[in-house]
Amino acid sequence: MDFPGSAPSVGIEWEVALVDPETRDLVPRAAELIARMDEVHPGHKVVREFLANTVEMVSGVHDTIPEAVEDLHVQAKQLMECADDIGVNLFSAGTHPFAHWGDQKLSEKGSYQEIIERTQYWGRQMLIWGIHVHVGVGSKEKVWPIINALMTHYPHILAMSASSPAWEGLDTGYSSNRTLLYQQLPTAGMPYQFENWEQWEEFNRDQDLSGVINHTGSMHFDVRPTKYGTVETRFADATMELWELAAIAAYTHCLVVYFERRLDAGHELPTLQPWHVAENKWRAARYGLDALIITDRETNEALVTDELDAWVDRLAPLSEELGCAAELQDVRKLIARGGDYALQRAAARKHGAAPEPGTRTRGDDGVEGGFTQPEAWIAAVDLTVDSLRKSL
């Protein structure tokens, strides 16, 4: 892979689903929606995705987070207008709370069918939507030190974005069930902690020779370098509101630039043992903003919210320079309000059907949450749809 290197520009990709206004279930109408966009807004940047119920908004390359977010804001408003025209709603969260994976249709693209042929059951489970943030990095020599340092902030970003507590009508007890689903694919999950670009090239050569890349197109690691000269974070759940997306993107942008400048100044970047990174990923997926995370190689721990608060202070001067000070401060607004996963649970519980966390609803196995009827989570879908609409 070539890595041209670039200034610390930013770009954002935002996946959203389409739901029926009456049933609140997913509907495979992405092609119809994009056709409407073609009519009304020719030249738009909305694209189809793996499933026929999904579209993705793609920002251009921008210098600042406000510019990239405004790009998405315009696209989202146009998309919502066209969705209204054809009678569907936009839904932005990590997973849908009650849709069944077996009912979903693939988009019409040969490579998608090939992926399903290879991944089978787990490939069909991918009813998931996320936010991808690209940040430019100056040279390939810096890429893997920066990615390894970013992995120490995996739980921070995941906890902020977590918005997928339910699956097929089940309260999973997790804050981000999307995280557990996506890592089942053979080329997904956490990247290996490569020491340099040469090791990354050797890895890709092995994947090419073994046919892995031929089957999947590329590696889909949670964080990865791209041919555009960027480092891409891919593990955040899609958020219910645009300002949340902006806060997460600002935090990511500031971190990458902060780490690159530390490298330029001759400092060694922080890393965690791979087993600590894996544990932090699980804790954030499970507990969201209530997670107690491992903060250093000595296995000290802190609440993820305390860590976020401290890092917002540390990154504040840089955020002023990068033009995203307000967006970074919204990290604290998100913490104070609570995560999307908690709001979805509260909406479902308010309508009387979602079990309280810790309730044993099937035998005495102690599993948190429990099985319930899909109607229990209609309120959560309504909350998600309404929150997105109001945030635009």
From Swiss-Prot:
UniProt function note: ATP-dependent carboxylate-amine ligase which exhibits weak glutamate--cysteine ligase activity.
GO molecular function: ATP binding; glutamate-cysteine ligase activity
Name under which the protein is recorded: Putative glutamate--cysteine ligase 2
Keyword terms, alphabetized: ATP-binding, Ligase, Nucleotide-binding
EC number: 6.3.2.2
PANTHER family in UniProt: GLUTAMATE--CYSTEINE LIGASE 2-RELATED
Keyword ATP-binding part of the UniProt annotation: yes
